Amino acid sequence: MRVLGIETSCDETGIAIFDDQHGILAHQLYSQIKLHADYGGVVPELASRDHIRKTLPLIEAAMQQAGCRSEDLDGIAYTAGPGLVGALLVGATIARSLAMAWNKPAIPVHHMEGHLLAPMLEERVPEFPFIALLVSGGHTLLVRVDGIGHYQILGESVDDAAGEAFDKTAKLLGLDYPGGSALSKLAEQGTAGRFVFPRPMTDRPGLDFSFSGLKTFAANTIRSQGSDDQTRADIAHAFQTAVVDTLAIKCKRALQATGLKRLVIAGGVSANKELRSQLAELMHKLGGEVFYPRPEFCTDNGAMIAFAGMQRLKAGHTTGLEIVVQPRWNLETLAPVTF
């Protein structure tokens, strides 16, 4: 079976074709970073317009890359949410139109389920059950995963997502958009221990997160300590260490509470080297394993949507003619997949 995947939830246009026997046959990605850089963040209207321009050409490129014709496809998967409503509608409309024209089923995919399943595109595939840390610009979730569609949210951010906090703090430090990766690079030049940031919500029981206070703490530190190059690097180092420590502490709590020994990390922030290093060390101490996608599949992409769509297609989870998106969509409401 082959599935075309379409990802347009935010500021990346991702297209891929996944074959259940041969894996990823094609992968095309266009990033809108330059488009939004002058604004310091994603402008929804501009994002939607750019998806309109890029989606069909990227689909054509993916079909050529895979040597695939419409009759070779078994379904068309698209991100139906969560995300920016206009951007989601572009992908959903194109996917639904192609499905109708080619007489193929359309498969709506939850964006975070795509991220959650992305490590299954690698050679080392996690077995169920496991704990998943989904950490991106829009979400920070700790999820118990007993199977595809069998999700229990154990903890989530009560305010800013971790990736959002990275980007906002990077902006305070005068770094270009998107700031998360730039902040991590700057942190490499920082001096450990000069500044110590709090580890939010780790002084109480529970698995929820809060990162908005770290941005405020960073702003106050910049205001009081100045913004010379070394100070900025030291602040970046302290901020990143606080976020990574907080994520690791909550992961450890979730693993100990459930007794599970497998941890999956996914989403854009899962590409962070310090986070990967600390969670690898944690799982080594706990006698467990950690799994994550290759860096190109940490950020939004069509491959994860094609793969998740394949699982849903096999379970018969397709839609009719309606074009429906869900800008807000609780992961726990997804139907379980049984083959």
From Swiss-Prot:
GO terms for molecular function: iron ion binding; N(6)-L-threonylcarbamoyladenine synthase activity. Fe cation binds at residues 111, 115, 300. It is found in: Cytoplasm. Its cofactor is Fe(2+). Its EC number is 2.3.1.234. One of its GO terms (biological process) is tRNA threonylcarbamoyladenosine modification. Its main location: cytoplasm. It catalyses: L-threonylcarbamoyladenylate + adenosine(37) in tRNA = N(6)-L-threonylcarbamoyladenosine(37) in tRNA + AMP + H(+). Substrate binds at residues 134-138, 167, 180, 272. InterPro entries: ATPase_NBD, Gcp-like_dom, KAE1/TsaD, Peptidase_M22_CS, TsaD. One of its GO terms (cellular component) is cytoplasm. The keyword Mitochondrion does not apply. Keywords: Acyltransferase, Cytoplasm, Iron, Metal-binding, Transferase, tRNA processing. Pfam families: TsaD. The keyword Transferase applies. It comes from the Bacteria. Binds 1 Fe(2+) ion per subunit. PANTHER family: TRNA N6-ADENOSINE THREONYLCARBAMOYLTRANSFERASE, TRNA N6-ADENOSINE THREONYLCARBAMOYLTRANSFERASE, MITOCHONDRIAL. Required for the formation of a threonylcarbamoyl group on adenosine at position 37 (t(6)A37) in tRNAs that read codons beginning with adenine. Is involved in the transfer of the threonylcarbamoyl moiety of threonylcarbamoyl-AMP (TC-AMP) to the N6 group of A37, together with TsaE and TsaB. TsaD likely plays a direct catalytic role in this reaction. HAMAP family: TsaD (MF_01445). Belongs to the KAE1 / TsaD family. This is tRNA N6-adenosine threonylcarbamoyltransferase. It comes from Tolumonas auensis (strain DSM 9187 / NBRC 110442 / TA 4).
